[in-house]
Amino acid sequence: MKREAAQRKDRAQYGAKREKILKAAGPVLARNGLGGTTIEAIAREAGLDRATVYYYFSDKYAIYREAIHDGVAELVSGLEEVSKADLRPPDRLRESMRTIMRAYERHYPQLYIFFQEGAGSTVIDTHLNQDLIDSGRRAENLIEATVREGIGSGEFHLALPPKVFAKLVVGMLNWTSRWFVPNGALSAEDIADGMTETVLSGIVQRTP
């Protein structure tokens, strides 16, 4: 019994230390980007020595992968649910943008880091698991599908190809990383709704 209790304690301590490192990595990655981040900087932020960080993670890319995994999974899962809901394209686009901003708020700053670093870029992809790469692309594809649906129904009129427009929408949301902080004057949903109205005012087909 004592041995089992000790093993449980060891597992709990191991998990807690990993979480401490992952939490410390967020602000370091946000400040420096993946390229400018070092294990030394993460260790300083966590109040640990470099050797301790290396004990838990093989390199900064392993930290990066784990730090963003849950947020990316939640974001894509949320967008999948919205894509299946019985909504008109304008409402689906609005709810998709809300879903993205809510996920950004809950997983701040990890999700911003993922998209800022260029999900789908060759440099980043070499250090990500295939499921993360696919998830980043899936998020844009779901926005694109909503745009195509709106064009098909006659509700949207675009001056850009749907794929480019989807990148514009995601890029606009990503840009909020320059100024958005959780619990600020504007909530994630406030921002999403305001941006959606701005977007829709430019693409919704108006009746003459």
Explain the meaning of each model-derived region:
Residues 17-25, 42, 67-71, 75, ...:
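Generic hydrophobic, amphipathic alpha-helix propensity
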Residues 90-94, 130-135, 152-168, 186-193:
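All-alpha amphipathic helical-bundle segments outside canonical DNA-binding/catalytic cores
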Residues 17, 21-29, 100, 199:
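Short hydrophobic clusters on alpha-helical segments that form packing/core surfaces
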Residues 66, 80-109, 162, 166-169:
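Hydrophobic alpha-helical connector segments
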Residues 84-86, 125, 136-165, 180-183, ...:
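Hydrophobic alpha-helical bundle segments that form small-molecule/ligand-binding pockets
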Residues 1-16, 207-208:
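N-terminal intrinsically disordered/low-complexity leader segments
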Residues 20, 28-62, 66:
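Helix-turn-helix
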Residues 102, 106-144, 155:
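Short secondary-structure transition hinges
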